[in-house]
Curated annotation (Swiss-Prot):
Partially overlaps YBR126W-A. Residues 22-47 are annotated as: Disordered. It comes from the Eukaryota. This is Putative uncharacterized protein YBR126W-B. It comes from Saccharomyces cerevisiae (strain ATCC 204508 / S288c).
Length: 47
């Protein structure tokens, strides 16, 4: 989980943009990404 969080943390807003673009095409990845992405970006990343 930490590694995954770090990757999303580095991406920051970029991860959200990619998630929005790829979301409609891959629902499975979209469902798995949002919760971890949002939590990691807010908690782990100050920016």
């Amino acid at each position: 989980m930490q590694v995954y969080c770090n990757v999303l943390c580095r991406c920051g807003r970029g991860a959200d943009v990619l998630r929005d673009r790829v979301g409609p095409r891959t629902k499975r990845a979209n469902q798995a990404s949002p919760p971890v992405g949002r939590h990691s970006s807010r908690l782990m990343c100050p920016g």
